[in-house]
Amino acid sequence: MKDYLRTQIRRVLDALGDVPDDFEIELEAPDRPEHGDLATNTALRLASVLGDNPRSIAETLAERLRERVDPARIKSVEVAGPGFVNFRFAQDYLFDGLADLLAQGDTFGQTDAGAGERALVEYVSANPTGPLNVGHGRNAVLGDTIANLLAWTGYDVTREYYYNDAGRQMRVLAQSVRARYEALAGNVPTTTLTLDDDTTVEVPETFPEDGYLGQYIVEIAQALYDEHGDALCATDDLAPFRAAAETAIFGDIEATLRALNIDMDGYANEQALHDEGRVDAVLDGLADAGYTYEEDGALWFKTTEFGTEDDTVLVKQTGEPTYRTPDIAYHTAKFERGFDLMVDVFGADHHAAYPDVLSALDVLGYDTDRVDVILYQFVTLVRGDEPVKMSTRRANYVTLDDLIEQVGADVTRFFFLMRSPDTHLNFDLELAEEESEKNPVFYLQYAHARICSVLDKAEEVGFSHDEDADLALLTHEDEIALIKELLRFPRELQNAADARAPHFVPNYLRDVATAFSQFYDNCRIIGEEQELASARMRLALAAKTVLKNGLTVLGISAPRQM
């Protein structure tokens, strides 16, 4: 409807003249239902351009729109306040929309806005140095839901996980496993480390500085010892220790993601970029363009020419690239694979790094308008208003597995999606553990299960939701309000996809559940005449469809019973 009205308003403005071609027409739902279904502030914004008072412009706009709009879609066009133009939908439009919703069923909400376009969404992208933590969980769920939204709006979506496997972190990981392995293989002196929280831990003397301390390291070392005995003590090669750690940890990571209903289409790694010559190609390309220089034994990128305070190191004095360099190479590979849209989901700690990557891509001739970087803020576990630290066995931090085990996958996903990515998230364990409608995800799932129960009971006593039911019988204000809410679904999904804002969807679904509750409280099904009962059952089925489809987009189950 917004697209239709924008077209009609644009045609009226073209006839008025003196309106800039790039003038954007704004249409929003009024805060109060009595002001109509949609409103535009066009007259207010054009007053200075047209040299007239906004109320007069609004009157002219409304008069001409009344002549243009389809009465089967728009019931009335009204002027309100200082110059707003309000629109009310015709009931035929609502009933036709409801019939379309019911006909589309499980595909309602899908659009072809991105048809013919290929999108790559990169998310999680945690290095395989340990179990996923709670922050990785927010990344995973945000990225996966953005991918779902893009798929629902027509894109051909690829979900990809990138990790650095050629740098210091992986070397320290291998050294950590080796030290634990050597301790299992013989008497190795130990030393005591004091951690940030003042707890202490005994480690072998050969344990590396900043080594990985979790129990999972001991488990990997034990598996190596069980397979090889002490044979690996004779080699200085870290490769078997790194390979064993990477395989074991990635197996755990993939299992964690599956528990959250996340399946990646592919994995990319830093070592492959080196092997393919992509990292060297990036350095050569930036040098040829005159954007690098050597100083103090390091290779620098002239990022100050793009507004940064300091230039950025691309290759350290040791000859080892900084992590930005393979990241640039990875993005060149994305472009060369032909993706029209590339979405990167990063933690807020990347806020200084990703502009350097985009600047390098600009220098290398790539269209960075096709890259969309989503930065998310971090997560704090709280109980009520108090921060909490959950105990954990396998790592010296709270793992994502710990959280899923405590509150469940559906709740975990939903809570990660309740707030805008750029907002710090307090994950309230007390609320998450609540198995009642106080819990926001349970509220939606209860609404879905309640509708299933209502429809089942109605059928048991002889009512049916006849496909030919007369939807025009749905004239109660709560019926009309629910229909309007349901028909917003495709637009809400499109807005969420366009803005890469998954939190739009749970907020909208809460409105649907509330509107259904209001309808059900005031519009009974069992006990009404068959024709009206059938129409109301069709409306209930439509509400069930929207709730289920919305939860599907969020990667959350829609149970028939609770």
From Swiss-Prot:
Motif 'HIGH' region in this chain: 126-136
EC number: 6.1.1.19
GO term, biological process aspect, one: arginyl-tRNA aminoacylation
Keyword field: Aminoacyl-tRNA synthetase, ATP-binding, Cytoplasm, Ligase, Nucleotide-binding, Protein biosynthesis
CDD domains reported for this sequence: Anticodon_Ia_Arg, ArgRS_core
Predominant location category: cytoplasm
Catalyzed reactions per annotation: tRNA(Arg) + L-arginine + ATP = L-arginyl-tRNA(Arg) + AMP + diphosphate
Any GO CC annotation of this UniProt entry: cytoplasm
Location of the protein in the cell: Cytoplasm
Gene Ontology MF, one: arginine-tRNA ligase activity
Pfam families reported in the protein's UniProt record: Arg_tRNA_synt_N, DALR_1, tRNA-synt_1d
EC primary class: ligase
InterPro entries in the cross-refs: Arg-tRNA-ligase, Arg-tRNA-synth_N, Arg-tRNA-synth_N_sf, ArgRS_core, DALR_anticod-bd, Rossmann-like_a/b/a_fold, tRNAsynth_Ia_anticodon-bd
Family under the similarity heading: Belongs to the class-I aminoacyl-tRNA synthetase family.
Record's subunit section: Monomer.
Name this protein carries in UniProt: Arginine--tRNA ligase
Organism annotation: Salinibacter ruber (strain DSM 13855 / M31)
